[in-house]
Amino acid sequence: MKILMINVVCGIRSTGRICTDLATALEAQGHEVKIAYGREKVPEQFKKYAVKIGSDWDVKVHGVKARLLDGAGFGSKKATKQFVKWMKEYDPDVIHLHNLHGYYINIEVLFDYLKCSGKKVIWTLHDCWAFTGHSAYCDAVKCERWSKGCYKCPQIKEYPKSFIDRSKQNWKKKKTIFSGVSDMTIITPSHWLAGLTRVSAQFLGR
């Protein structure tokens, strides 16, 4: 089986190490694994798995868009289109998503492909970003606006920090973008995050 993981980093930090640990275990079981990543260096022993999405310059431009326009996840359109072209050629059996924030991938372009691909999709959520209009860790300020619709984000100055607040628009866009994938399983590393995910508008009932 061919398995493709997508994460902001590969082989470093918590989520990057989770991906490479999974890749090593899956490879030992006879599967073929690739990890598409967006930024930073990959340790030598994990380069056999690594597929770079876009360029370092693209990450910087995406970061500027996020800072100026609260556009985290909505930059990197050209890079993501090129990556989707590569995915079609690679033709994985399973696509395992991890952190999609980090200024490296366009969620609209990615999910347009996932919705029409017919692929089995697994998404491991490592934080709250997927179901909020801005924040990655909404629980830090005990905010529950995300459950019905974000607005006036109390964490707009926190990662992914922005000069303006488009949390209301982002929340609505994410709800639309993340709906409609026919075969998608959501995984969380904790009961706490699972509880939040189940009642979120983006993943209600999954």
Q: What is each model feature region?
A:
Residues 1-206:
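Catalytic cores of nucleotide-sugar-dependent glycosyltransferases that transfer UDP/GDP/TDP-activated
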